[in-house]
A protein has these predicted regions:
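Long, amphipathic alpha-helical surface segments
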Residues: 18-53, 65-72, 76-94, 118-173
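Surface-exposed patches in mature extracellular/periplasmic domains of secreted proteins
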Residues: 54-58, 96-106, 144
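Universal eukaryotic N-terminal targeting presequences
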Residues: 1-3, 17
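Generic short alpha-helical segment signal, independent of protein family or function
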Residues: 91-94, 98, 112
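Short N-proximal segments of mature Sec-exported proteins
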Residues: 104-118
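Intrinsically disordered/low-complexity terminal segments and short unstructured peptides
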Residues: 12, 22-25, 107
């Protein structure tokens, strides 16, 4: 009985420290993302093209955040709260693409719209040609980047304009 009580106490102690570690990690990720010189441009681009979502956009909240199973979100969030949520999402994605150097922010913004699994290969998707090209140290990626503008096989002009604007403002030669 004493052993169970000690295990329970240990588990409670560990669980109690998780949120602090999580917020510490989130703060570190946000600082890393926000230190990028073009982070604010990336945030403004996503805000412009995503727009603030409402109830008709369920399960998307804020500026395109997809609600996770244990999250409690409201459509009544302020623009500042929605932007903070967007920055947190972009920071988490930025961590995944950091190894791509100058192209990390560009891949971060693209993955926010198309999904990181499509780019990095996950769930039946092979690794994208864009990422394979970058891994081969070939940075001539304009065509591959702007190719992510199709829906059901057809080019969508508004998405094409978005990709061109993202590339123009975020690509670092």
């Amino acid at each position: 009985m004493m052993c169970k009580a000690l295990l329970l106490l240990l588990a409670a102690t560990l669980c109690g420290s998780l949120p602090a570690q999580d917020t510490e990690e989130t703060a570190r990720l946000l600082a890393l993302f926000n230190s990028h010189p073009k982070a604010d441009i990336a945030v403004e681009l996503v805000k412009k093209y995503e727009g603030l979502h409402d109830r008709s956009d369920y399960p998307y909240y804020g500026y395109g955040h997809r609600r996770l199973p244990n999250e409690k979100l409201s459509y009544g969030m302020t623009e500042a709260e929605a932007e903070a949520l967007l920055r947190k999402d972009l920071a988490v994605r930025y961590r995944l693409f950091r190894k791509y150097g100058k192209d990390a922010l560009l891949l971060t913004v693209l993955s926010y719209n198309v999904g990181q699994g499509v780019l990095l290969g996950h769930g039946g998707h092979p690794k994208s040609g864009l990422v394979r090209k970058l891994e081969a140290r070939n940075r001539d990626i304009y065509r591959e980047y702007t190719a992510y503008c199709r829906y059901k096989g057809k080019t969508v002009r508004s998405i094409e304009r978005r990709r061109k604007m993202e590339f123009l403002l975020l690509y670092e030669p």
